[in-house]
Amino acid sequence: TVYVNGLPIKRGESEDYIIDYNAGEIIFNSTFPITSEMRITVDYQFSERNFSRFTVFGGSNYETEKLKLGVSVYSEIDSKNQPLQQNLSPEQVAILSNAGDDESLMVAPSGVPEVYNENRILYKKELIDGVEAFVFSTNPEDELFSVKFQAVGENQGDYILVNSNAINNIYEYVAPIAGVPQGNFAPIVRLIAPEKLQLAVINGSYRPSEKTDIYFEAAGSKNDLNLFSSLDDANNDGFAGKLRVKQNIIKKDSLWNLSAIVDADLIQENFKTIQRLYNAEFNRDWNLESPRGDQQLLSAGLELLHPQKGLAIYKFEHLNFSENFNGNRHNLLASLRFNRWNVFSNSSILNNQSDVTTSTFLRSFNRVTYSFDKQWIGTKLATEDNEQRTVSNDSLTPLSQRFKSYEIFTGIGDSTKVFVEVGYKHRVNDSLRLNRIEKVNTSNTYYVKSK
């Protein structure tokens, strides 16, 4: 799914974008122009086939007049005896069994004895300053090895790339200086461990009376990152739970209805799932950077609903990560209809503190339209003001920014079928300059929409 400014857009040649799988590209259609003011998020799933994998899922439901229950399970397990991308030797299996979940330990020497072949890059072993190293050799009388070199980072290895040719690259040993490695390659091969992910979920709803609705969900996960090893298995199991209660305070079918809503999410740090739990911009909404620990998301609010006139919702949210984050957010949403007037407003204000930053984030989007029989006119006002400061010196971070935009538009036709709409948008962008948020540019956009 592709999101623009947090909203999903449609895929297709006659819609917003297409995907070229051969080139690995997302191409936006000419009917969906991209500007520098847009935030683009691509949400996708992939699976690496390193072992034969067995996937099983299923579920069941139970329902009565007041109670609904659902149970589902999901399991994906790599067969550790059926590798697809690597042939593991007994020595390499032993390395994996001692590595636990630490990928930095999942490496093995890559040198393999090889007979002389003029079409291959081969190495011999040689003592250099008391260290046994691989040295490029073309002498058929030497004991030769085929060696794979892995990039390990600057000053993390003892080999450097000295020559590239049509057959293969040639690497050369460089002795450490004062104990500091001088290369960025090592004669190792990274081993990939078989994994397991299992999920069990039970959810349901209970309606003890006409005015009360209760929804609940509990899930457990088991995520083993190395089936060859029992080390580090203490963090395999995780739990997540959700409870939502809606209580109708005033309930009349043809009039305004008032409800109170309480919602609680608990997610342990070790809980794993196969897809995201929240919206694509959850981290941006809360100014999250690197949250750690168990998560608690608590919310409470009021919902005012009228069958013909729309709704208004106020919600207070509290988000906590046990090790380094605490935040509170107020949300106000309204979508109302008064004869020919339509009013929409979505605003929020966030205050949070982490071990690194504190921030205040104000957001507001508002739209008012007036409809004629086959025409409409309207205006929009949107603003954001995001100030993030580092705890250590109270300076603004580069993510601090602010904007305001004003828009007017008019259209004719049926906005859900065939229509033409023209409009004008003025936007002012502010960004960080010399530790101050200052105006950096303005834009004026004239547009025509049609269908």
Feature locations, PLM:
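Surface-exposed, low-hydrophobicity segments enriched in Gly/Pro/acidic/Ser residues
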Residues: T1-K451
